[in-house]
Amino acid sequence: LLNRKYGITEEDFISAELSAVPAFNACDIGFDRSLIGSYGHDDRVCAYACLAAILQVKEPRHTCVCMLADKEEIGSEGVTGMKSAAFDTFMTDLCESQGVPLRVCYEKSFCLSADVTAAYDPNFADVYEKRNSAFVNYGMGLCKYTRARRVLDEANVVWQMAELGKVDAGGGGTVAAYMAQRDIDTLDAGVPVLSMHAPFETVGKLDCYMTFKGMKAVFESTK
């Protein structure tokens, strides 16, 4: 069947990188259709918001870069992960063309590490700290903020502070640590997600829009 339909042979599996994913489409959820249910919101929803935002930036005061990295769930390993030299190589070429040392560029840069955060789920309240959790349709979730809060407020971005889960209850990670190791001020921010890593994840439409709006505000910031 695979050969007849797609031309795939046994040899292709030796070097293929395959993913088995649910076949259903994204859909609206709720009487008010305020939610989106789909496979793979983590982290396509933030990647889309970032790409859509940078494409709308016309004449930024500062150089804008959108880096879409892979393999975050297994520690950002490999040539497409954030641990690879790809980002540093690109930034070195960019800095050399401007006659600026790479380290100086990093010290004066700001990074928005766009990744989803866990939204409070009342069905599994024992693994959340309710007062420190993000809620669906309460805005863009910030895990830590540096100098971006004023930028978001000036752009009328609805945002909320959040943590991934209760202390000692486990949780996920992002690429923020790898950016901070480069001496770049880094903000961990993204869309709150219900049922993260499940075949059917849920996000709020308001959160998606505010994440896009927040990223656009950061790209267009004059500070």
Where do the model's predicted regions map?
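Domain-scale recognition of functional cores that engage charged ligands
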Residues: 2, 15, 40-53, 99
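Active-site-adjacent substrate-binding region
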Residues: 2-7, 11, 119-198
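Soluble metallo-hydrolase cores and metallopeptidase-like ectodomains found primarily
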Residues: 1-38, 56
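His/Asp/Glu-rich mid-to-C-terminal helical/loop segments that flank catalytic regions of hydrolases
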Residues: 54-68, 191-223
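Acidic/histidine-rich catalytic neighborhood of metal-dependent amide-processing enzymes
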Residues: 48-135, 222-223
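Acidic, glycine-rich active-site loops and adjacent beta-strand->loop/helix elements
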Residues: 24-26, 68-75, 116-118, 165-169, ...
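A short glycine/serine-rich beta->alpha loop
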Residues: 31-41, 72-77
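Catalytic-loop motifs flanking and including active-site residues across diverse enzymes
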Residues: 42-49, 185, 207, 211
